[in-house]
């Protein structure tokens, strides 16, 4: 009775029909190992080899495969709130965290390749990047102010040239009218001379 109790406390609890074969194989392993140990201990002829029946490994392998396949099916769709579900959730969280760290590391390496004067330390790379961005923004602001100033100067110059062009155009028109008046006066004077010459003759 004591022997049976020592074996029974090693047996796994039954949680479903699929574990009957697993329990059988587990019991056979215990009996076989226990029998082998006692036979060797009480063998009066140590020099003689004791032949023991081979364990049914095929049955054990098939049982293990059945249990493994059953376990895989359970792991594919674990019940919400179960230990497997929390384990899968933790593994998923760890995978997401690992990818996030890899993305951050790749981004810092890319910054180190772009920003001049960076060291290998990640903290120094980030500080140098912040300084570089500030300097770029300052340069951008200076370029914007310079562009606005140049635009104002260009607009003022264009306005001055437009006024000068209008003044020159007005002067040209007055000069042209004066020329036309002088031409008319010259033609009128020629006509008077012709009349006087004809009258004298």
From Swiss-Prot:
bHLH domain residues: 88-136
Listed GO MF terms: DNA-binding transcription factor activity; DNA-binding transcription factor activity, RNA polymerase II-specific; protein dimerization activity; RNA polymerase II cis-regulatory region sequence-specific DNA binding
Cross-referenced InterPro entries: bHLH_dom, bHLHzip_scCBP1-like, HLH_DNA-bd_sf
Gene Ontology CC: nucleus
Subcellular location: Nucleus
Biased composition (Polar residues): 59-74
Disordered: region residues: 53-74
Pfam families assigned: HLH (PF00010)
Keyword hit for Lipid biosynthesis: no
Keywords for the protein's UniProt record, in alphabetical order: DNA-binding, Nucleus
GO biological process: regulation of transcription by RNA polymerase II
Top-level taxon: Eukaryota
Record-given protein name: Uncharacterized bHLH domain-containing protein C3F10.12c
